[in-house]
From Swiss-Prot:
Function recorded in the entry: Acts as a transcriptional activator or repressor. Implicated in the regulation of cell-type specific gene expression and play a role in inductive events during lens development.
Keywords: Activator, DNA-binding, Nucleus, Repressor, Transcription, Transcription regulation
Basic motif: region residues: 231-256
Keyword Amino-acid biosynthesis annotated: no
Name used for this protein in its record: Transcription factor MafB
Comp. bias regions, Basic residues: 130-144, 160-172
Quaternary structure annotation from Swiss-Prot or TrEMBL: Homodimer or heterodimer with other bHLH-Zip transcription factors. Binds DNA as a homodimer or a heterodimer.
One matching Pfam family: Maf_N
Family: Belongs to the bZIP family. Maf subfamily.
Amino acid sequence: MAGELSIATELPTSPLAMEYVNDFDLMKFDVKKEPLGGRPDRAIRPCNRLQPTGSVSSTPISTPCSSVPSSPSFSPTEQKTHMDELYWMTNSYQQVNPEALNLTPEDAVEALIGPHQMPPQMQGYDSFRGHHHHHHNNHHHQNHHQYQGLPHEEMGLPHQHPHHHHHHHHHQPSPSPSGSSSSSQQLQNSHQQHQNSSAVEDRFSDDQLVSMSVRELNRHLRGFTKDDVIRLKQKRRTLKNRGYAQSCRFKRVQQKHHLENEKTQLIQQVEQLKLEVSRLARERDAYKIKCEKLANTTFREAGSTSDNPSSPEFFM
């Protein structure tokens, strides 16, 4: 706490300096250089009361006091050069909002030193100032045009970046006409290729592709593109494979029907042979019975003739 109080005593306490930073435009008003002598009548005030009541400043209140360098113009004991004043003004410029004040540290240095006291080493820096001031004014004009409908409290630096990103989020670039034209050209080319391939396929029928030899097909395909030739030969190969599969299937079905018919015929022949065998067996049995009857009749006749003799030798 003691260190912070000691740092706060070294800060500029003049209300004119704070109003010079916050309210006035250095391009319109001449700034009177204060003498280097001490100012005992100026009361030292704390760092948190440096901002006037009626002034509007974009500097955050939470800025630490140690980040603000002391003013060389208010030092009662030490003589500062113009380069030290330049360093103090550039550091003070970093603590305020440059967008709200619309000034650069080079403007403050030029107003403080004057055109007749410009050292030689500042001439190169002054040439760089013109380009930087032009770029700074263009950037401020763009931000003012973008946020001209917002209140003054919402134009601070912390609030500009979210609106800026939100603006870019909602206004994304639309596809270029060259991309749409290239896509339409690709669709047209693909449609034309499809028509050409259809014309090539319609030129030959399926029967012609199957019956045509490879040499004859190559002779007819001269002048066509490689993709069309490959597609047509693939179609011919597919048709031939399909025909071969259908032929094999037909042959298998035909052979199956032939075998079934032959089987039926063989079954019928077996039945006929069975009937013939049964008929022959019946005839055999009949002939056997007839043969037995004839044998019995012959034996009886032979026995009767031997029992009744009729010859004259029988009586002798």
